[in-house]
Amino acid sequence: MAGKDVNEVGRLDEKKKKKREDLLNATYELFTSKGVFDTSISDIVKKANMAKGTFYLYFKDKYDIRNALITKKAGELFSVAYEKMYRKKFSSLEATVICAADVIIDQLNEDKTLLEFIAKNLQWGLFHKVLLEGENDVSKSFFDWYSELIATSGRKFKNHELVIYMIVDLINSTCYNVILHEEPVGLPELKEELHQLIPVILRTQEIVEKS
């Protein structure tokens, strides 16, 4: 009997996860085609083929689901970066961070809809939530991996969370026009500049002990 109860709870949890995922997917389609302002909760539940009451079991309003979507999509970016990076060895901390930045940039270049959505909505509070809580174990693992990189480098920084935020925000703000409109330069040129700027960010945030 106990086994049946456990199985039933498991099935209910999976059902809830699927409904939440369906709501997120429907919302993403609408937000990226109509915009957040012009999308109503009625639009979302119609797209997801659910009753309006079901929406409120998971989210308070459309801004709550927008925040959940940003957390999810940004988390997926970091998940891919982690999967591609965590087994690789690099000559320096700078080289590692530059390569991780390139992985994130390449994802945004491949999915311009995602670029537009994240560029308009990513904020420090949500970024912090993605890194520390993670939409899934892998996105949180990115921050654990990054923290370990800092620790094993033997270098100290004022705030290593702020360092990665500054780098991601730099990518977010500079890539938008370059990827979508190839202005003021093309992506290869922008990458070259970012490769120069990332070490500068690391140096300015580093605590250098005086001998």
Q: What role is predicted for each listed range?
A:
Residues 30-64, 68:
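Helix-turn-helix
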Residues 79, 107, 113, 126-154, ...:
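Amphipathic alpha-helical packing segments from all-alpha helical-bundle domains
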Residues 19-28, 44, 65, 69-77, ...:
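Generic hydrophobic, amphipathic alpha-helix propensity
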Residues 151-197, 208-211:
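Hydrophobic/aromatic-rich alpha-helical bundle segments in the mid-to-C-terminal region
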Residues 1-18, 206-211:
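N-terminal intrinsically disordered/low-complexity leader segments
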Residues 82-86, 118-126:
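Short linear capping/connector segments at secondary-structure termini
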